[in-house]
């Protein structure tokens, strides 16, 4: 299945149903009181994380989703039915962003997590709500409020413990194949990897971590060169970044310059991502002698002004790979992922009682406004007709 990590969709919550103006009419009760019911609330739109999905491809073809409108109120004090909610399933790791305001609505990082992204409209009030001692035949009602509507940007960000960085052909995919059961394509030309891939590395029977491989970066990637930096977002949730460097590039480029290129592109993309723990790993030492590989690595570090804190490995032969994996596992266990603070659902400021009282209080009646038979039923010939109260 094609890997799609971005989608733009239109979501519309249901409008609230309108209130009803009605009067009770039965045999022997020709002048009954008001019995118009309230409308129903509009349906909401939710996102739910599903671990069985791994792409947003479903939302590349169907882009518009609308919840059901609440039904209007009816006579005999019947309340309209609430509109049905709709729930959209997305992969675990999806981020929801309002496309107009660029506000991040939330991240779905656990299976089964549910998030409200569009709230349905509130119901309108029927004329029975406006009955009082001085207004016994009310002709007022309120309409339901509109539901929320927004363009929603969905971004899938892979959940991995370790992220791989490096130029094309640095050996990232070979490393993933060596430490996990993942089988990304490996070839001797740049940009063999076109989409991110995940692999699970087992250090022993009870310990493992997830590693992510993304397409290689090149100079100018932040400006769109190569495949750009769009895949770097998949590394934002990693514990540690592994910067894989070809210690003896076939194009005879300087590894120190190659390291600087990646660091520069990281800072161009996100300073927060650039400041994540990043380990320097020199790969392809199998084509050099041990002494030559060590000397070359020390020379590179001296020119970079860094400490002698690096690894020398060969992903092709597996040399020193186990040591690196164990150190990664120890680091992850010593620095557990900080759980996102559980934010209690904010108390809904909209209170039905307050809303009803506010709507009713806007209508002030005096005895002078009432006829002696004001309690009487509403006549269809009444010139004044129905009064609809609109929320300012």
From Swiss-Prot:
Residues holding Mg(2+): 173, 193
Chief localization: cytoplasm
Limits of the OBG-type G domain: 160-333
Chain spans, region Disordered: 361-392
Any one GO cellular component localisation term in the record: cytoplasm
Enzyme class per UniProt: hydrolase
GO molecular function: GTP binding; GTPase activity; magnesium ion binding
UniProt keywords, alphabetically: Cytoplasm, GTP-binding, Hydrolase, Magnesium, Metal-binding, Nucleotide-binding
Catalytic activity, EC: 3.6.5.-
Record-annotated Obg domain positions: 1-159
Ligand binding (GTP): 166-173, 191-195, 213-216, 283-286, 314-316
Keyword Ion transport in record: no
Cofactor: Mg(2+)
Location of the protein in the cell: Cytoplasm
InterPro entries in the record: G_OBG, GTP-bd, GTP-bd_Obg/CgtA, GTP1-OBG_CS, GTP1_OBG_dom, GTP1_OBG_dom_sf, OBG_GTPase, P-loop_NTPase
Feature: compositional bias, Acidic residues: 365-386
A single GO BP: ribosome biogenesis
Subunit structure: Monomer.
Protein name as it appears in the record: GTPase Obg
Originating organism: Histophilus somni (strain 2336) (Haemophilus somnus)
Lineage summary: Bacteria, Pseudomonadati, Pseudomonadota, Gammaproteobacteria, Pasteurellales
